[in-house]
Amino acid sequence: RDPEMSRGLGDVYKRQNLYNPEFYLLAYANIAKSQGSMTQGVDGQTLDNMSLPRINRIIESIRNRTYQPKPAKRKYIPKKNGKLRPLGITSTDDKLVQEVVRMILEAIYEPTFSNNSHGFRPKRSCHTALTQVKKNFTGVTWIVEGDIKACFDNFDHHVLVELLRKRISDEAFIGLIWKFLKAGYMEQWQYNCTYSGVPQGSGISPICANIYLSELDNYMQEYKEKYDCEPERRRTTREYERASRRYRKARKALMGAEKSTPELVKEFKDSRREKMSQHYYNPFEEGFKKIQYNRYADDFVIGVIGSKKDAEKIKEDVKIFLQEKLHLEMSEEKTKVTHSSKPVRYLGYDFKVIHSKNMKRCKNGDMKRVWYGKVFLYMPKEKWIKKAMERGAIQVKRNNDTGKEMWRPMPRKDLMNRSDAEIVSTFNSEIRGLYNFYRIAENVGALHKYYYMVRYSMLKTLAGKHRTNVSVIKKRHMVNGVLRIPYDTTKGRKYCEFYHDGFRKHSDGYDNVADVMPSYRKYDSRHTIVNRIKAGVCEICGEHADYLCMHHVRTLKSLKGRDIFEQKMLKMRRKSLAIIRYFITNFFLTFPSK
């Protein structure tokens, strides 16, 4: 490409994206939706008081290359295994710039990512990953469970930058990403440098992780092309051919007989059952090999149609590739080879390949062996029990005589200070959250046991709050078997109903396109936060002004209506207000100078 042309295209890209205030407003609208935007970084600022002058100052500092990210504030959150996961809370200005960088990187790399990658990508989730496993892993005999040790903490910065340079020629943009990688973090008021990894909690860490691990995706695609081997014509097994001849003979005899006899019917059914119980193809046929691959963030699984020796070799080859090319290490404890008939834990589900030869009668009356070789997804029993115990909804004790577990619903004292409608709403959201995650599991109906326990926990919580018993609560609020709690609004009395929609299994994890809000409803609105700040109209007094800023609160629930800001927010049912400097000065709100 001509250098002058490349430089010209780079200038256009910078004007349209990196130096464009409209792009920053779009990024601001994205991060404003998150409650994390109101979390303070090391500078003590939040998204509150965002304005166009503040955005223009950020753009100018990026243009003249004086922009310097602040170190992240380190916090620790508990992991499932009892250990702690470090999170980096970045400053508000850094969150905004990182969102801009994320959108640019996503536009460049998203079309090139593998279809087998599902983590941190638009319109993809754990459900799409599991649905792909269910569809593509049919008939696999061995499964390689892959886990990368401390993946996000061990990304090599130099390797990441070299990967970025393959697609991006703008060194200033890469330099900006390098600054974020080297920004460091504050812990116990002490600054610490970062020599590797991308901080979890950073706006660019998910896209950087996918760019880094897409090399593994590409490697597995090349490996699959070399490994897969399928003969032009696969031979049927001798057992199946023999059973087929017996079935055809029995069927011909039954159809040709003037009158069916019990012996002919029995022979026909037995021969059909024998035929359906045999393999059509030999699953261990010499020369027939295939692998399937699926990744979500740093977790991946590889399905192998082949021998255990093949699976062990694939595991070792992947380990060597990660060490030599990406400078990452696989966890020896968590990375293992498992037979497909045994449950494999992946993304909170258990899955295994069914080897049952049982048959099922279809709608047209034919008998089919519908399960053999299929992948089934299961909800682990301990998951919903653990959730209920963590929330204090049940108490599990073991009977000393029989050794059996005794489950007892318990009132939740942490919810008793809330209103009745809030208590029911909290239980509803917890039930729906668990069901929505496990809705594609074969045994999702097992949540009825969870529902029974949680329902009585909710009734006991209401009874404990009102110092009565469960029978009184039922008699007071139960209507046609559904518990309804009344609450008053400005439009009259309404009712909050306890969840009663059941736990129907969904066929796959892909959302219905019909449920997606049309773009003209989603974006083309004068009430969006971007249009409100650009309109230049103060939402307190209605005056036009060039200098508007956005005032934010974390939740509407925390507002008491003590001043004009809170009264207006409660009236508009919004967590943000576009206001002018006059009100900021008079109400002692901090605001950055022009």
What does each model-identified segment do?
Residues 2-13:
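Single conserved hydrophobic/aromatic residue that forms the stacking wall/gate
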Residues 31, 60-83, 92, 96-104, ...:
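Reverse-transcriptase-like RNA-dependent polymerase core
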Residues 115-116, 121, 128-321, 325-329, ...:
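Conserved polymerase palm-domain catalytic core
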Residues 305-314, 323-325, 345-536, 575:
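Active-site and adjacent loop segments of nucleotide-processing enzymes
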Residues 538-541, 580:
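Short cysteine-rich clusters marking metal-coordination/redox-active sites
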Residues 542-543, 584:
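Cys/His-coordinated zinc-binding microdomains
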Residues 544-576, 592-594:
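Histidine-centered nuclease catalytic patch
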